């Protein structure tokens, strides 16, 4: 009843119509405030008169009864809000109801009137709500009619049916109010927290009846529309089970049933107000009124309170919002019946929410008032009907004033509601205005201003309302109620309450007194809602209204009737308002109406002062007064008996309906279950079918099936023939017997028959025999796979054993060579080494070319296309020698390739990309075979290759299987076409071919050992000499004129731009990055012209330069094709890479593809920065801008560029970034800059090992700056910017492709870096600068020319070609050695190929644009290394272009591999450092990485294939560069001394690297070059490259397959891959011994110059980084914990530490980890450490990476999580040992360096190494410091160890993980901790950012890290791998373990 009454009050406007119908009884009561109200009243009066509760005026009802919904009433106005169609529907429905239920005609008519009134009145008063209400009203008409009837029966049925929304609210008002009076029972309607008690309608015919009941009960909160929406459900409570279930059958509704409206939409769950405001308010009011009419009387309290609840509800009206406000509803149930007390209490309490909801709609407050009145009346003991009428009418009357109050209350509520339904604020306001337009509008205006306050207040009131509602237990005490309501409802509600008390004056005339109280209460509400003033105002007004109307509306029937009429009007208005609200247009009208109302109200009452609520009330009151003549109330509770019986019937019906609903529910559930089962079955069946289809579609399977069918057919035929033959034999036998038997005669006919049969059988047999060969061939084709598999299983173990032996031998040789190189680094054996290496490479290249051709032919294109992705992997394996390297660091690169295998493959062979996979594989196998002979030269590569080869074999076998399947299919086709062609022999041939193919891919490894051993012996010596010469001569040359042999190789490299698989080694040897790279390396080594095939191949490779070494065209047969294809591929790849660029730069560390794309992008960006994505462009921007400038300048005048760099021209352009970092924090900046520079330099170093050397020197110098720059992200950015710019310059240099230029440029860069470093550490910088400048200037001279062009790909090619020619050794004197023995690596996505300078030249010339070349010179390596600070490591994106890494110094293939590995790994490590340092700066780092990648790309480009070739060329280039770098660093004054020592140690690394151009040299050089310039590959690619390089190091193969495991990359792996790539690249940088040495010099210089400041800075940075590192470490730990490869890395690291042979194996393990690292950024960090280690180890570890990147990584990762650093370190040290025979020497040296480095530096390392565990790293580093000496030997044994010389660099590196400088710094700090440097690189790549970046945050730690560099390097290394993410996450752990392991 309360609900009803409340609703009546609320809907009073809408209800006015009903009320007016009820006003039939008292038409005079309806004083419509607004014309609409009047009209509604009149209409309703008409209807009332006609239908006065009876079906008197159905015609009247014909008057758009829809108005309730906003139809006729202001339907025109409301039509704006609601569709006329709705009105029509409602009207038709009501008419139908009237006809169907004549006895309810009056009620229905009243409903129609209400609808019409609402349509108009809402327009006038509540346009917002009418629509909403209208919709509900529609249903209300049905349901509400019934409900209302039932309610009206109980509660003044008449008012209910008409006045209180009973009017068609309950559509099924079958009985008149009399029937309603004889309500079948009571229904408790709950909405939100409101519960209202309503008389049960005599009939509940449909769900619409229930909805109408709800709408009438909660007019403000609910509308038919809302209730009909699918998101709203009506639940009925099963008392027996105490559960709610959806009401499906209205017959389930029985007396005392508790119905609940549940809004499934959470947004509306507690936002009743919004919708209430929209139309719920009106609906609720109408419902309330209807209920008030019907149930109201029976439950006066309920009715009275329901209005209150409804007013509250209105705020909660929106079903969603209404839910909370629902309390009014809740009260309805318990409180409603207790309306007076209970409602006051419960409703009030809940009603606080109700008021809230009410506030949503002004009317609700009126209803609330009514509610209060009703409860009062109830309290007074008035009849429910009377109460309801009184409540509704009296309230309406009093509340017409009150109504205005209500309107204001609604207005206020809307304001209150806003709180719940801010969104509905306007709607609520509209509805409020619709309800009480005048006051509402005034209130709305006020409240809109106060709206939110009120809304808040409302919520306050809502909550308070709940509380306050309860307080006024007696609705009679309106003040209490009002206090509560006002509180809850806010001013509007308060006024309504106030009015209600007045209105309730019949029941609560005393309430007039209370209005004051109410006002006070309202004040509390106001206070609650901030609308206290408004509330007070409205309450006061309402008080006035109440005072005025209280007398009028006391218990007088007339007043009550009038109030009911008013309520009807209000209900109609509410409906109209809701309709208007729902149909926007009428809203304005409603507002106008509201304005009118307000005006009227103002005129009528002086309530305008309040929020206008009083006005509305006044207006309504006036209306009520006008219609004061109380419409004869329909039989109030006269029909109570009937009502009860009806209620009981209804209850029984409800029960039945409940049961039916339950049954329906069960049925539906069953249906759903069946559906689900069917779906499941369907899915299963479809899955099975799909599987079957796939199986059938499988070519092998298809062939099998076909063959089997043929075989069965054949057997069937054979069977028949046999049967016939048997029969014939029997027949002949019989004839024979007969012939012998005299008794029988054998006739001639019998004989002829026999002969005929025999002829048939014979023909059949002949046919069968003819068919058999075909069948045989087919079956053999099918079985070939099995045969191959069996053969593989048989032969693989032996192959692996041989590979391991080779790896071990290579490890020994490389160790020896490393010592040799270290000792003879400055001797000048470069030329001899280079010559030998070149010769070796030529041989290898030739073999590779042959193999590639063979493989290409044998493999078959189909297989290629089929196995393209796989090819990348398997190719890595086949190209074990070189590809292993590729696999090791190319895992990262390859990943991009795998993203776009075509990219990598194009470099190798276009078929590779598209269908070349098989060719590259076979080519790889061929290359492997050809490289196998070389393998001896590269023992470690062989060893690594072995491990890698395992993987290779697996991949190859898979490939071969695919290939063989493809071939089998093809052959089958051929056989089918030419059955005769295939005889047993041919089939045997086919099998043999297949076997050969398999063997090519698999046996190649064994072959290399056989062939390889010979080169090994020579190569090591030569390599050593070369390394020494190359480093010395190159460095010297660089110093002298920068025209050391290394510069010339760069030109060849240039020739072999990334597109070509060729990379020029430092020596100038062009290493085919892919197989072709190896071939190219040979050719290049021979000279650009030595092997036309190679050149052709190179060129083809070059063409797809963008496809990193995906398909080295060098395959002779497919050279042209490959060339073209590669060019196409290169273009495609370029496009792809350009696309990738965007993500690439972002994914510098994460995605190999990103890296390649970066490299490619860089190449492209170098040419056109526009191509680079914004982010890339940022990096590239400075990078590219500078690079472009550099390119232009380089192209125009490389020297100019160098001068720029040297003089600061670059600085002017770059300085903004470089100097920025420097200026920001000179020491930090220098470190950061160094770090970045190092990364960039590493990139550039990759592009130009010479440059890298310079870069390293530069980086060393810059490293301090970079480190310091890295102290802050800003410095890091500056550094990155610097790095980017410098990198850009270097990149330009790389682009120029003139190794010399690159070298010079790098040196210049280094000079700049050095200068900058000078700023941070003048001593070191000066030393580095002096050295750098010497080298740089000289190198610049040499490099300037060729390298000028190097910048752009094409320019690069042009320049590169010149320089590469020089690289060929003819190009430049410096590269003489390189020319003779210079090894270049062409690194593509799938392969690492050793190329000769000639090959490189050819490739570069062919694919100038598509190939990135990086010249790595021992001397230059140092410079690049310094420069690496600026141009840390070009991020190599093999995806885009093959990178040719040209080692300017002659070196063994294995040495080259080793150096290459160092290059790559450090880059990655640096990246990891970057990553670690800036978990925060991760993006920046990625940008850095992008720059780095770009630099790498550029460098790669400049180095011709440094990126793709990076893996290989990187090894070799670095191998060659490293000696040079070492030489350069050694030459560095001051720090140079250190560098020399370090270099000697490094030389140790470098020399062995250069000398052992093979594996060790490669590892060492890789390490050193790494530090010089690191190629940043995506982690996976890096891992793959590392693995491949390791394999190459072990096997010395010229072509290594880089298998990138991209699957891992997709998850965190991708990011980790990026990290791994960065990490490895970073590592590569530290591994650049020269650069490390330089960095060490720098660091020592810096340390000496500002060791304290730097240490502090490093420490700070470290600590800063450590925090982020801790997080990163945690993340990494999580990631790593998920990656089993960790253990592998650990094993790798440990093995690495344990023994050189193990080192290769461990390298493999580490490599896998790197692979995983590439796969998993965080986890990959640790693996990357391994990878860098593996890379350092060279190919030796590479095989592992390639072969078991995942497994090993998985293994390592688990343990490596904490041990990654350790193992990584160990691995690096071991690798170093492996690579460096003098690893211990280096270790020893490094030890001193490490000890010399303060513990603080170790912290830097610790952060660096502790990127995984930046903090533990610090402590670990402390322990590591001691350990560094102990570990350093092992570290020294690692390439890092040689790089211990540059531990200072390591520190720098750590700071400039980005640049790779950090590692150098770390190394520099470590001094002897080159491996540490390596580790920092690795860690700096990942972990170092905390440390490396320590330079910025962990700057102090960076120092420590540097100290730790020796021991911590590994730690850092692992953290790097682990640390990329482990930096922040698991790096911490990794570092501790690292420290432990280090110790």
UniProtKB/Swiss-Prot annotation:
Full protein name: Sickle tail protein homolog
Coiled coil: 557-581, 644-685, 957-985, 1464-1490, 1656-1686
Pro residues: bias regions: 308-328, 1044-1053
Upper lineage: Eukaryota, Metazoa, Chordata, Craniata, Vertebrata
Residues bearing glycans: 357
Modified residues (Phosphothreonine): 470
UniProt cross-references to InterPro entries, sorted A to Z: AIP3-like_C, SRCIN1
Any single biological process term in GO: embryonic skeletal system development
């Amino acid at each position: 009843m309360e609900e009803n009454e409340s609703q009546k009050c609320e809907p009073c406007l809408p209800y006015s119509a009903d009320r007016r119908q009820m006003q039939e009884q008292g038409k005079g009561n309806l004083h419509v405030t607004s014309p609409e109200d009047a009209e509604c009243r009149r209409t309703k009066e008409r209807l009332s008169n006609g239908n006065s509760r009876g079906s008197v005026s159905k015609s009247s009802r014909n008057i758009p009864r829809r108005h309730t919904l906003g139809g006729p009433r202001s339907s025109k106005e409301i039509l704006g809000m609601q569709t006329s169609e709705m009105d029509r529907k409602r009207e038709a429905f009501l008419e139908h109801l009237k006809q169907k239920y004549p006895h309810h005609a009056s009620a229905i008519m009243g409903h129609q009137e209400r609808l019409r009134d609402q349509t108009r009145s809402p327009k006038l008063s509540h346009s917002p709500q009418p629509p909403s209400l209208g919709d509900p009203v529609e249903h209300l008409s049905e349901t509400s009619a019934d409900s209302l009837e039932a309610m009206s029966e109980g509660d003044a049925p008449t008012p209910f049916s008409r006045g209180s929304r009973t009017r068609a609210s309950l559509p099924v008002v079958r009985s008149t109010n009399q029937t309603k009076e004889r309500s079948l029972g009571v229904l408790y309607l709950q909405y939100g927290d409101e519960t209202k008690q309503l008389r049960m309608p005599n009939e509940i015919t449909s769900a619409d009846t229930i909805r109408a009941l709800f709408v009438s009960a909660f007019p403000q909160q609910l509308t038919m529309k809302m209730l009909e929406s699918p998101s709203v459900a009506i639940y009925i409570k099963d008392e027996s089970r105490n559960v709610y279930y959806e009401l499906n059958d209205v017959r389930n509704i029985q007396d005392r049933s508790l119905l609940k409206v549940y809004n499934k939409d959470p947004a509306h769950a507690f936002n009743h107000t919004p919708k209430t405001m929209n139309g719920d308010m009106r609906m609720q009011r109408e419902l309330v009124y209807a209920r008030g009419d019907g149930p109201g009387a029976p439950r006066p309290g309920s009715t009275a309170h329901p209005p209150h609840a409804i007013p509250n509800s209105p705020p909660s009206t929106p079903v969603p919002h209404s839910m909370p406000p629902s309390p009014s509803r809740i009260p309805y149930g318990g409180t409603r019946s207790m309306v007076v007390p209970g409602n006051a209490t419960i409703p009030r309490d809940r009603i606080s929410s109700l008021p809230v909801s009410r506030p949503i709609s002004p009317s609700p407050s009126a209803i609330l008032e009514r509610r209060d009145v009703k409860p009062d009346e109830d309290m007074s003991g008035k009849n429910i009907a009377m109460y309801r009428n009184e409540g509704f009418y009296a309230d309406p009357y009093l509340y017409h004033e009150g109504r205005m109050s209500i309107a204001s209350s609604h207005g206020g509520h809307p304001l209150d509601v806003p709180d719940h339904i801010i969104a509905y604020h306007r709607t609520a306001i509209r509805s409020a205005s619709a309800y009480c337009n005048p006051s509402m509008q005034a209130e709305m205006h006020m409240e809109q201003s106060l709206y939110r306050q009120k809304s808040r207040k409302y919520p306050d009131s809502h909550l308070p309302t709940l509380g306050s509602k309860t307080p006024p237990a007696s609705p009679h005490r309106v003040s209490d109620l009002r206090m509560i309501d006002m509180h809850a409802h806010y001013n509007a509600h308060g006024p309504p309450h106030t009015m209600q008390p007045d209105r309730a004056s019949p029941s609560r005339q005393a309430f007039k007194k209370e209005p004051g109280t109410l006002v006070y209460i309202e004040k509390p509400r106001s206070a609650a809602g901030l609308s206290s003033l408004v509330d007070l105002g409205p309450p006061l007004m309402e008080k006035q209204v109440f005072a005025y109307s209280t007398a009028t509306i006391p218990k007088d029937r007339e007043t009550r009737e009038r109030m009911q009429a008013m309520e009807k009007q209000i209900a109609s208005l509410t409906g109209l308002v809701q309709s208007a609200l729902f149909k926007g247009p009428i809203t304005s009208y409603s507002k106008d109406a509201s304005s009118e109302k307000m005006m009227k109200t103002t005129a009528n009452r002086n309530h305008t002062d309040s929020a206008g609520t009083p006005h509305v009330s006044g207006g309504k009151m006036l209306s009520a007064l006008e219609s004061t003549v109380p419409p004869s109330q329909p039989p109030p509770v006269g029909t109570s008996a009937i009502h009860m019986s009806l209620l009981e019937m209804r209850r029984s019906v409800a029960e039945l309906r409940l049961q039916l609903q339950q049954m329906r529910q069960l049925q539906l559930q069953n249906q759903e279950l069946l559906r689900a089962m069917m779906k499941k079955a369907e899915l299963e069946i479809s899955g099975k079918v799909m599987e079957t289809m796939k199986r059938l579609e499988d070519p092998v399977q298809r062939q099998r099936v076909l063959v089997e069918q043929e075989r069965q057919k054949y057997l069937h035929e054979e069977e028949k023939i046999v049967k016939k033959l048997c029969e014939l034999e029997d027949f002949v036998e019989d004839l024979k017997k007969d012939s012998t038997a005299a008794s029988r005669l054998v006739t001639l006919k019998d004989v002829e028959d026999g002969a005929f049969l025999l002829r048939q059988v014979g023909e059949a047999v002949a046919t069968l025999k003819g068919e058999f060969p075909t069948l045989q061939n087919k079956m053999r084709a099918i079985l070939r796979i099995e045969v191959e598999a069996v053969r593989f299983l048989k032969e693989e173990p032996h192959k692996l054993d041989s590979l391991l032996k080779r790896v071990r031998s290579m490890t020994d040789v490389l160790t020896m060579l490393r010592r040799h190189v270290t000792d003879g680094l400055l001797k000048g054996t470069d030329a001899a080494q280079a010559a030998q290496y070149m010769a070796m490479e030529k041989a290898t290249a030739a073999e590779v070319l042959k193999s590639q051709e063979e493989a290409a032919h044998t493999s078959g294109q189909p297989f290629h296309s089929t196995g393209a992705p796989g090819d990348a992997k398997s190719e890595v394996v086949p190209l074990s020698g070189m590809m292993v390297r590729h696999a090791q660091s190319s895992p990262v690169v390859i990943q991009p390739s795998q993203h776009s295998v075509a990219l990598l493959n194009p470099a190798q062979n276009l078929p590779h990309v598209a269908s070349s996979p098989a060719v590259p594989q076979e080519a790889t196998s061929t290359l492997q075979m050809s490289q196998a002979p070389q393998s001896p030269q590269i023992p470690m590569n062989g060893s690594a290759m072995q491990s890698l080869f395992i993987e290779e074999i697996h991949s190859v076998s898979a490939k071969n299987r695919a290939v063989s399947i493809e071939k089998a299919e093809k052959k089958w086709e051929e056989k089918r076409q030419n059955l005769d062609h295939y005889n047993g022999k041919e089939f045997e041939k086919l099998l043999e071919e297949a076997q050969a193919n398999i063997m090519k891919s698999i046996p190649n490894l064994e072959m290399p050992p056989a062939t390889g051993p010979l080169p090994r012996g020579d190569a090591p010596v030569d390599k050593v000499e070369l390394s020494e010469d190359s480093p010395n001569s190159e460095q010297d040359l660089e110093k002298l004129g920068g025209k050391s042999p290394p510069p010339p190789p760069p030109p060849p490299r240039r020739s072999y731009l990334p597109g070509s698989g060729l990379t020029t080694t430092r020596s100038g040897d062009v290493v085919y990055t892919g197989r072709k790279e190896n071939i190219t390396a040979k050719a290049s080594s021979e000279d650009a012209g030595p092997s036309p095939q190679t050149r052709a191949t190179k060129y083809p490779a070059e063409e797809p330069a963008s496809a990193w070494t995906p398909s080295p065209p060098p395959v002779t047969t497919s050279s042209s094709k490959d060339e073209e294809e590669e060019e196409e591929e290169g273009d495609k790849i370029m496009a792809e890479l350009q696309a990738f660029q965007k993500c690439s730069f972002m994914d510098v560390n994460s995605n190999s593809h990103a890296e390649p794309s970066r490299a490619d992008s860089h190449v492209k960006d170098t040419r056109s920065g526009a191509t680079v994505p914004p982010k890339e462009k940022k990096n590239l921007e400075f990078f590219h801008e500078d690079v472009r400038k550099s390119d232009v300048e380089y192209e125009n005048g490389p020297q100019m560029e160098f001068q720029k760099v040297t003089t600061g021209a670059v600085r002017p352009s770059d300085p903004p970034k470089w100097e920025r970092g420097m200026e920001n924090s000179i020491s930090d900046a220098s470190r950061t800059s160094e770090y970045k520079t190092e990364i960039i330099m590493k990139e550039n170093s990759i592009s130009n090992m010479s440059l890298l050397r310079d870069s390293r020197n530069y980086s060393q110098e810059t490293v301090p700056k970079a480190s310091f720059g890295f102290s802050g992200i800003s410095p890091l950015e500056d550094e990155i910017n610097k790095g980017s710019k410098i990198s850009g310059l270097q990149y330009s240099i790389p682009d120029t492709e003139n190794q010399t230029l690159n070298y010079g440029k790098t040196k210049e860069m280094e000079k700049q870096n050095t200068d900058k470093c000078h700023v941070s550490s003048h001593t070191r910088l000066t030393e580095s600068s002096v050295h750098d400048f010497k080298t740089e200037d000289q190198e610049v001279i040499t490099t300037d020319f060729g390298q000028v062009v190097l910048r752009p790909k094409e320019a690069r090619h042009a320049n590169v070609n010149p320089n590469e020619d020089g690289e060929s050794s003819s190009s430049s004197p410096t590269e003489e050695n390189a020319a003779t023995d210079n090894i270049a690596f062409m690194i593509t996505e799938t392969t690492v190929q050793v190329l000769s300078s000639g090959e490189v030249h050819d490739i570069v010339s062919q694919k100038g644009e598509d190939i990135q070349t990086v010249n790595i010179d021992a001397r230059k390596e140092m410079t690049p290394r310094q420069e690496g600070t600026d141009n840390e490591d070009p991020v190599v994106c093999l995806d885009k272009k093959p990178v040719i890494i040209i080692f300017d110094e002659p070196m063994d293939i294995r040495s080259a591999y080793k150096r290459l590995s160092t290059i790559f790994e450090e880059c990655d490590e640096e990246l990891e450092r970057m990553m670690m340092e800036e978990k925060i700066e991760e993006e920046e780092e990625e940008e850095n990485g992008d720059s780095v990648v770009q630099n790498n790309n550029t460098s790669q480009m400049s180095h011709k294939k440094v990126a793709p070739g990076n893996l290989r060329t990187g090894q070799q280039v670095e191998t060659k560069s490293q000696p040079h770098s070492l030489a350069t660093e050694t030459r560095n004054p001051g720090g140079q001394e250190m560098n020399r020592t370090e270099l000697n140690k490094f030389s140790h690394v470098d020399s062995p690297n250069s000398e052992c151009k093979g594996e060790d040299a490669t590892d060492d050089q890789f390490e050193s070059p790494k530090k010089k310039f690191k190629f940043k590959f995506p982690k996976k690619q890096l891992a793959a490259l590392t693995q491949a390089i390791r394999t190459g190091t072990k096997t010395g193969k010229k072509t290594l397959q880089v298998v990138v495991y991209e699957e891992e990359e997709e998850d965190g792996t991708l990011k980790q891959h990026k990290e791994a790539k960065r990490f490895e690249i970073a590592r590569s940088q530290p591994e650049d011994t020269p650069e490390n040495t330089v960095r060490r010099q720098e660091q020592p210089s810096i340390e000496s110059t500002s060791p304290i400041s730097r240490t502090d800075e490093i420490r700070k940075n470290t600590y800063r980084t450590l925090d982020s590192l801790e997080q990163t470490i945690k993340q990494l730990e999580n990631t790593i914990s998920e990656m089993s490869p960790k253990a592998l890395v650990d094993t790798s690291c440990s093995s690495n530490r344990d023994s050189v042979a193990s080192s290769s194996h461990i390298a493999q393990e580490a490599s896998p980890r790197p692979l995983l690292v590439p796969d998993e950024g965080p986890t990959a960090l640790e693996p990357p450490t391994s990878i860098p280690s593996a890379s350092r180890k060279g190919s030796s570890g590479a095989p592992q990476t390639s072969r078991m990147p995942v497994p090993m990584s998985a293994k390592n990762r688990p343990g490596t999580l904490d041990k990654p650093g350790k193992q990584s370190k160990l691995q690096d040290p071991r690798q170093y040992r492996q690579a460096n025979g003098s690893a211990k020497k280096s270790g020893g040296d490094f030890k001193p360096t490490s000890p010399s480095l303060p513990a603080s530096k170790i912290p830097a390392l610790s952060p660096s190494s502790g990127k995984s565990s930046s903090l533990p790293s610090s402590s670990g580093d402390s322990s590591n410091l001691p350990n560094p000496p102990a570990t350093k030997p092992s570290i020294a044994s690692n390439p890092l160890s040689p790089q211990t010389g540059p531990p200072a660099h390591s520190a720098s590196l750590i700071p400039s993980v980005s640049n790779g400088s950090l590692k150098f710094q770390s190394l520099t700090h470590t001094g002897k901790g080159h491996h540490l440097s390596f580790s920092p690189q690795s860690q700096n790549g990942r972990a170092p950012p905390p440390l490396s970046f320590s330079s910025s945050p962990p700057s102090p730690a960076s120092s420590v890290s540097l100290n730790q560099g020796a021991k911590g390097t590994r730690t850092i290394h692992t953290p790097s791998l682990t640390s990329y993410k482990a930096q922040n996450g698991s790096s911490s752990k990794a570092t501790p373990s690292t420290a432990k392991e280090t110790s």
